[in-house]
From Swiss-Prot:
GO molecular function list: 2 iron, 2 sulfur cluster binding; 4 iron, 4 sulfur cluster binding; biotin synthase activity; iron ion binding
Catalytic activity: (4R,5S)-dethiobiotin + (sulfur carrier)-SH + 2 reduced [2Fe-2S]-[ferredoxin] + 2 S-adenosyl-L-methionine = (sulfur carrier)-H + biotin + 2 5'-deoxyadenosine + 2 L-methionine + 2 oxidized [2Fe-2S]-[ferredoxin]
Record domain Radical SAM core: where: 41-268
Protein's organism: Shewanella halifaxensis (strain HAW-EB4)
Known partners and oligomeric status: Homodimer.
Gene designation: bioB
Binding site for [2Fe-2S] cluster: C100, C131, C191, R263
Manner of cofactor binding, per the entry note: Binds 1 [4Fe-4S] cluster. The cluster is coordinated with 3 cysteines and an exchangeable S-adenosyl-L-methionine.
Top-level taxon: Bacteria
Keywords tagged on the record: 2Fe-2S, 4Fe-4S, Biotin biosynthesis, Iron, Iron-sulfur, Metal-binding, S-adenosyl-L-methionine, Transferase
InterPro entries, alphabetized: Aldolase_TIM (IPR013785), BATS_dom (IPR010722), Biotin_synth/BioAB (IPR002684), Biotin_synthase (IPR024177), Elp3/MiaA/NifB-like_rSAM (IPR006638), rSAM (IPR007197)
Record function comment: Catalyzes the conversion of dethiobiotin (DTB) to biotin by the insertion of a sulfur atom into dethiobiotin via a radical-based mechanism.
Pathway: Cofactor biosynthesis; biotin biosynthesis; biotin from 7,8-diaminononanoate: step 2/2
Family: Belongs to the radical SAM superfamily. Biotin synthase family.
Name of the protein described by the UniProt record: Biotin synthase
């Protein structure tokens, strides 16, 4: 098979034609590319932790963390360092190779940057890859996080430029692209994807993929989320997306961004094992691991490992550690949970 050529000049019509392929033809093309670029049975595992929850000033209609919607979510301050490290140790011992930290902010405040920098350094010292999603970043903030050793920064485009205004009005599409440019210029790896099932049309799903695939450099990681409908948000009563359209989105992402990790992200809790298996065949090779994604449900770890065994999949190996080191990390995490200490960072005012 000839080497896959990377492209950054996809036309909307080309991507729409991929979406329109018969399912067998689409899956064959996507899986062939997937096998050429990756071990088809290896899945990268990340753990996602909300380090600051709720009270976000943005109006994203899908998000339970927006201060504008009554979703019953309790807001929390920025987590204390040891609370974060306890979660990171537990994640590594459970098999995660990357630890992702998310904060419900429009953008991080300058006063918090030194603390965030230290957080990255401390998690890196555990031997894990690191990722953060903190909202918009200036070039200076991106450089600060890069200097700390942050491996990935996540900032999703969410949907197509045309449908974007129906999803969020408090942040422009261009501001998202600017943040991705700042991240890439800093030397960090880019994690960017979107959400499907938000009432968009098929052409909008094609438009999202077009925007991602036509970035100067493809995102290193592309999370594809299925909308999780949360009571109290404007999108709580939307009709469900046909699951096969979700599989098509995964497949088209794999074809247009052949060397990127495509992450089967939010919404897995509501997916059957058979649907997830189709997504892995279509080119998904990364998941979030653990019972919660920021504030929404996710499959239990044992369920994921059981599915992996049934499908013959295996986790990507992170930095090697001994059984004794893993047991020590778990013991330290358990001991920390027993301590009567604040879970929150004193200076992290909402």
């Amino acid at each position: 098979m000839s080497e896959v050529q990377l492209r950054n000049n996809w036309k909307r019509e080309e991507i729409e034609s991929l979406f329109a392929l018969p399912m067998n033809d689409l899956l064959f093309q996507a899986h062939s590319i997937h096998r050429q670029e990756f071990d088809p049975n290896e899945v990268q595992i990340s753990r996602l932790l909300s380090i600051k929850t709720g009270a976000c000033p943005e109006d994203c209609k899908y998000c339970p963390q927006s201060a504008r919607y009554d979703t019953g979510l309790e807001k929390e301050r920025l987590l204390a360092m040891e609370t974060v490290l306890t979660e990171a140790r537990s994640a590594k011992a459970a098999g995660a190779s990357r630890f992702c930290m998310g904060a419900a902010w429009r953008n991080p405040k300058e006063r918090d940057m030194p603390y965030l920098k230290t957080m990255v350094e401390e998690v890196k010292a555990l031997g894990m890859e690191t990722c953060m999603t903190l909202g918009m970043l200036s070039a200076e903030q991106a450089n600060t996080l890069a200097d700390a050793g942050l491996d990935y920064y996540n900032h999703n485009l969410d949907t197509s430029p045309e449908y974007y205004g129906d999803v969020i009005t408090t942040r422009t599409y261009q501001s998202r692209l600017d943040t991705l440019s700042n991240v890439r210029a800093s030397g960090m790896k880019v994690c960017s994807g979107g959400i499907v099932g938000m009432g968009e049309k098929a052409t909008d799903r094609a438009g999202l993929i077009q925007q991602l695939a036509n970035l100067d450099q493809h995102p290193d990681s592309v999370p594809i989320n299925m909308l999780v409908k949360v009571e109290g948000t404007p999108f709580e009563k939307l009709d469900d997306l046909d699951p096969l359209e979700f599989v098509r989105t995964i497949a088209v992402a794999r074809i247009t961004m052949p060397k990127s990790r495509v992450r089967l992200s939010a919404g897995r809790e509501n997916m059957s094992d058979e649907l997830q298996a189709m997504c892995f065949f279509a080119g998904a090779n990364s998941i979030f691991y653990g019972c919660k994604l920021l504030t929404t449900p996710n499959p239990e770890e044992n369920d994921d490992m059981g599915l992996f065994r049934r499908l013959g999949l295996h986790p990507e190996q992170g930095v090697a550690s001994t059984k004794e080191q893993d047991e020590a990390m778990l013991a330290k995490a358990a001991a920390q949970q027993d301590k009567k200490v604040s879970a929150f960072y004193d200076a992290g005012a909402l």
